[in-house]
Design a protein with these regions (language model features):
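Intrinsically disordered, low-complexity regulatory segments
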Residues: 1-143, 147, 166
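Charge-patterned, long linear interaction tracts outside catalytic cores
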Residues: 147-167
């Protein structure tokens, strides 16, 4: 949606995620105790594999590249901030000025008030850091423990590749 010198677009959930171990090193495509634990030196991002995601990401990227300033209006909270920052990073637009629209209500008055009170996006860097920490720690614990228990004990669940255990 474009007009009056601005454009509005949207994401739907997480369009961007952390790469899988095998994308860092092909040897990690094979699950083995010899390669555990695996923690990347620097986490890399990728698009979630979905045609709708790919199309929407390219729309967002084109708009970000044209923009002089980007306003983040994702959900007010850690995950909303993470969704925006991961997209911003994958678009290579992290050097662009960003502002934050923080909405606690969707009433017309609340939306107008929030637009009048746009904040510097970097005021929310700590919120992003917390979300990123949660995302990366979930990745480290989840992928390493799943691989460990699957290789060590085989499939113990009801079917597919599910692994069940008590923590």
């Amino acid at each position: 949606i474009e007009g009056h010198g601005c454009a509005v677009t949207w994401a739907f959930g997480h369009l961007v995620t952390l790469q899988e171990p095998g994308e860092y090193d092909p040897i990690l495509k094979r699950w083995s105790l010899d390669t555990l634990p695996f923690v990347p030196d620097k986490f890399q991002l990728k698009l979630i594999q979905n045609r709708g995601v790919d199309e929407q990401f390219h729309i967002i990227k084109a708009l970000f590249e044209q923009a002089e300033e980007i306003v983040c209006a994702t959900d007010a909270g850690r995950e909303g901030e993470l969704i925006f920052r991961y997209i911003l990073a994958l678009c290579n637009c992290e050097d662009k000025p960003i502002r934050r629209l923080w909405l606690n209500s969707l009433t017309p008055d609340a939306i107008l008030a929030a637009f009048r009170d746009l904040q510097d996006g970097h005021n929310y860097d700590s919120l992003y850091a917390a979300a990123r920490c949660r995302s990366e720690s979930d990745w480290i614990v989840g992928l390493n423990s799943t691989r460990y228990y699957t290789v060590r004990h085989g499939r113990i669940g009801g079917g597919g590749d599910r692994v069940l255990w008590t923590i």
